[in-house]
């Protein structure tokens, strides 16, 4: 997972004091954090993919940006403070080849799917549930496209965003 970078390798990131305490808004807040991380991560994926996959990077980046902005608007409508992007992120792997770039893309899509599934599980607001379902589906489809780039099988997951 791409996570906010900490000052030392043993320190855990400090929880955001602006994170809502209610489960629904908190899950949406966390999904925005995941979207920020994915946007950052695709900036590292882009220079390492094969030229044939540049369009996939562009599409993924546009989806994450659009999704983040729409989710920010949902929190804004409720006067909930939105998370800011971290100044840097700790990557789960070194990205130095087309293969490692695609693996990071799969991981980021999976991380976002987990976050959007949590929105579905935690909120009772119909607008958020609908948005979360669409977001989860988009992340699952994008992860499948990246798994295909890797030649992985199967390319899909039965229950995206979960450990089933």
Give short role names for the model-derived ranges.
Residues 1-164:
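All-alpha RGS (Regulator of G-protein Signaling) helical domain and cognate RGS-like helical scaffolds
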């Amino acid at each position: 997972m791409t996570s906010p970078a900490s000052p030392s390798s043993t320190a855990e990131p400090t929880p955001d004091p602006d994170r809502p305490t209610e489960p629904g808004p908190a899950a949406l807040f966390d999904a925005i954090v995941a979207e920020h991380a994915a946007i950052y991560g695709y900036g590292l994926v882009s220079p390492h993919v094969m030229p044939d996959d540049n369009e996939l990077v562009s599409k993924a980046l546009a989806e994450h940006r659009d999704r983040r902005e729409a989710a920010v608007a949902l929190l804004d409508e409720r006067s909930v403070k939105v998370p800011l992007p971290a100044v840097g992120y700790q990557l789960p792997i070194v990205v130095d080849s087309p293969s490692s770039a695609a693996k990071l893309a799969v991981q980021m899509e999976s991380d976002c799917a987990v976050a959007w599934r949590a929105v579905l599980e935690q909120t009772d607001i119909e607008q958020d549930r609908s948005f979360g379902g669409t977001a989860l589906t988009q992340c699952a489809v994008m992860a499948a496209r990246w798994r295909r780039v890797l030649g992985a099988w199967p390319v899909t997951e039965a229950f995206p965003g979960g450990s089933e």
